[in-house]
């Protein structure tokens, strides 16, 4: 079992994070923007996110990409290199970073309408899995 190539891990994580952030812009910033504005208004919050919030969302996307490629690199010796392993890694990261928090905070706590929770969570699986596959494509052990 080889060591994780830290340089490639960082490169792959950045690629994954950028892909996640770009897809998230289209899912939450364009497609779901009216629903987010409505949901935020129901909470008595401004309908649009601030520039600082958008920057923080992008940082979280980059960190998610780094974690996803770290998981990919960690499970690669057991599952083998390739898209199937990247999908497994992406799904694992999506479960922990998107599905569980969205169900807990958006659905169970009734903070946002169910349709918004469903759409943003399903959009998240596309974002994280696609980002992980993109980042894994540049990861190499040596």
Regions found by a protein language model. Give the residues of each.
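Juxtamembrane/disordered regions of integral membrane proteins
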Residues: 1-142
């Amino acid at each position: 079992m080889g060591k994780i190539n830290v340089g490639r891990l960082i490169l792959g994580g950045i690629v994954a994070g950028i892909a996640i952030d770009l897809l998230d812009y289209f899912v939450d910033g364009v497609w779901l923007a009216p629903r987010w504005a409505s949901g935020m208004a129901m909470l008595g919050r401004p309908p649009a996110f601030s520039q600082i919030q958008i920057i923080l969302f992008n940082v979280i996307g980059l960190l998610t990409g780094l974690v996803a490629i770290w998981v990919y690199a960690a499970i690669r010796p057991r599952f083998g290199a390739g898209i199937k392993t990247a999908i497994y890694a992406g799904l694992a990261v999506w479960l922990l970073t998107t599905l569980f928090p969205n169900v807990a905070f958006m659905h169970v706590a009734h903070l946002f309408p169910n349709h918004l929770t469903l759409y943003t969570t399903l959009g998240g699986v596309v974002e994280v899995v696609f980002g992980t596959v993109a980042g894994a494509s540049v990861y190499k052990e040596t």
